[in-house]
From Swiss-Prot, chains A, B, C, D:
Catalyzes the dehydration of methylthioribulose-1-phosphate (MTRu-1-P) into 2,3-diketo-5-methylthiopentyl-1-phosphate (DK-MTP-1-P). It catalyses: 5-(methylsulfanyl)-D-ribulose 1-phosphate = 5-methylsulfanyl-2,3-dioxopentyl phosphate + H2O. Gene3D superfamilies: Class II aldolase/adducin N-terminal domain. SMART domains: Aldolase_II. Belongs to the aldolase class II family. MtnB subfamily. Pathway: Amino-acid biosynthesis; L-methionine biosynthesis via salvage pathway; L-methionine from S-methyl-5-thio-alpha-D-ribose 1-phosphate: step 2/6. Binds 1 zinc ion per subunit. Its main location: cytoplasm. This is Methylthioribulose-1-phosphate dehydratase. It comes from Komagataella phaffii (strain GS115 / ATCC 20864). It is an enzyme of class 4 (lyase).
Length: 240, 240, 240, 240
């Protein structure tokens, strides 16, 4: 797999048949396949997944649901979903005409290394811009919205004056290299719930899909605010 | 209570039973529980209550309705509402699985000190940014939109060339300290219908929910405009 | 009348009875009372009529329909509309609990001096900001969108390289003085279909409600673009 | 034809009768006439086709569907559509009261020179602004979103570190001259799927309507990002 966009040369793995519709068709609006479609529309309207960019995955027990590559996010339907068994990494369902998301190994990293319940990847312009201004990490402190972000290494959320630190990894031509550096960042920053990718975007995960969504929203708010602070020459880490 | 976000360690006070559904379930779209849900969606779409931030409360006679902590604002339903008796400060209704908003003592200040009918709290980025540029108060004059803001100490609204002054209080780690300084600001600025909180957001109240909404909207417009004026080096208080 | 916002001291003129409902209640979505409500929602979502600011009026033959003062634009209903006879300036319909828009004499100027079919007034932030950067007139040339603006003094629209000139009048505490200067601007600039009001907003009119809407939209686009050009030091009137 | 806006002096060519309704009336939401209306609403909400500006056309086999001139994009209905035979350039359907889009010869260029399936023209402010900052071409490299853009001259999309180059042509008073320079740009830049028009906007095409939409979205994202990078003094082509 070579990118989060549709890779033309990529062979669709056909371990699961497209007839496994019961895995994704449900009247329950909280079914992962339905939630992915709903959230993709929200993210599209925020400008985070423009032009088929970005991705989202939800885990339910040992099954992970993944939005496909190359489909317009605001037009996603449950029938488009890939379903994978987390342990074996075999596809339980593969839509015949679609290609799996190149984000899949990155989502798997969050599931396996952090026991995440969902993982969101956006091409948010605020995320891209912040990676052009910061070097190894993005840092911000003493903004109330920081309280929405979890400490991860212990229970509870960051305090108002705590410093939020999000590592920035370098983008790569080849997806495999991005997986390696994402895993390294997750190890080096045990307290982070997100990783920025330079000139690319951001990965955010959480214990549940709703927590992942809230973390992503709060982080994007902080990235936007940081850019406005930078424009006025105000440091994002408050000096005392 | 430690923040407007969900405080994990906080004990939910169970003075009222969740069976008191008749307090919040109504076909009337103007019922406070319905209005709170409707307005939360509007505020979410404005980017004012991102990531479960912010809050809103409406008073109807001696009953106050308060949106809970930690619930995504755009997904709020009437069943999520807390109801409190204003005088005794006892909860008349407490949703079992939710925590009361940490904004509650701040909302109570507006109700008790100003006889407000509703109080809105947002994490508007314009509000946060303005508190990074102004010291003790935000001031603006000679903008038509100022006419939407009430004089408070006497009948009627501000005139075009009047100076709108909104006090800025310092944010605190602990909610109790914020309540004290909010009350002090309300006393020191008898003509204000809003208080800015540094690096946090804004509290706005009004005689009715619609007035509070209009004041909040008009103030946010003025805060945004002030930031644009600042960028161009134009003072927000017109010099004659 | 003292402002486009609700003037508390102002006596509602009760020349028409509120029972004249047939003037505003219609199943036809193109009825002026319905169109005003629909367009107010559009303008609200554009941030042009925040906090009850701004106004709109449509003329049908000798009857003019006017949105009331002090009502939230996105919650307007046909029953809120005032109806006036253009020639006598008598109200044909006066909603009992509402106050007529203070914009009324300004709308009348566009109807009487220019035979307009509709007049739109917004508090667009782009309009306000432009009046802080330009002196007597706003000018822009050589932008394709200019072709959406009419020549007024002759048939057809401006050409690409034509110069769009919109006069700027000073805002006033008292509405009457604004009416005078608006009329003067209309006389001095026979080719204009809009007048900017310093630190206040803009008035735009057209032969029909749709033309007024398109002109207002195109002008606001040009005002926004002019602000971006200013930020980059690019003159809005192209130098050859 | 003199502009993308309604040209008053232009004779409507009545080669086809308006009774040819079967060409545009369909229950199928993917019918070109329905898709044009749907996408015009999306583009309007993005601010790309404000004030009747811009245009869109879809080809189905030898028939091309074209949105008319002078109609508000968000209020377009299938009955407004022109239908033309690509080879003969004869109109198969001409709505009686409407004028054909002045973009028609430009759309035809994309169909004939590139075998496009759809062509989108917007007055995006990001497009206009970029043409004020760049000379002969707009260039950007090493941004992940570039991967959404096709190579055109060979299969597949651009790589992350590839340089996206979009030619900029000069705007003209007369439409004919724009057609000539657009065709010249298409010839000179065989790898481009878009052409910017100075002080005017952008033309984007693709093999299908969905590809054209995705390309246009991804390019606009890159144009916006380029403007933000310029503001911070960061070159859009990454230097190694
Ligand atoms: Zn990506
Ligand atoms: Zn708060
Ligand atoms: Zn006004
Ligand atoms: Zn055009």
């Amino acid at each position: 797999m070579s990118s989060c966009f549709c890779s033309k040369s990529q062979e669709t793995e056909k371990r699961g048949a497209v007839s496994e519709d019961q895995l994704v068709i449900s009247d329950d609006s909280t079914h992962p396949a339905n939630l992915i479609c709903e959230l993709c529309k929200v993210f599209y309207n925020n400008g985070w997944v423009t032009g088929t960019g970005g991705g989202i995955s939800i885990r339910e027990g040992s099954k992970i649901y993944i939005a496909p590559s190359g489909v317009q996010k605001e037009r996603m339907v449950p029938d488009n979903m890939f379903v994978m068994d987390l342990e074996s990494e075999n596809y339980l369902r593969t839509p015949l005409t679609l290609k799996p998301s190149a984000c899949t190994p990155l989502f798997l990293s969050a599931y396996k290394m952090r026991d995440a319940g969902a993982c969101i990847h956006t091409h948010s312009q605020a995320a891209v811009m912040v990676t052009l201004l910061y070097d190894k990490v993005f840092e911000i402190s003493s903004i109330e919205q920081i309280k929405a972000i979890p400490k991860v290494t212990e229970k509870g959320n960051l305090m108002y004056s705590d410093r939020l630190v999000i590592p920035i990894i370098e983008n790569t031509e080849r997806e495999e290299d991005l997986t390696d550096s994402l895993q390294q960042a997750i190890e080096e920053y045990p307290g982070t719930t997100a990783v920025l990718v330079r000139r690319h975007g951001i990965y955010v995960w959480g214990e549940t899909v709703w927590k992942a969504k809230v973390y992503n929203e709060a982080i994007d708010y902080l990235l936007e605010l940081a850019l406005k602070m930078h424009q006025l020459g105000i440091p994002t880490v408050k000096q005392n």
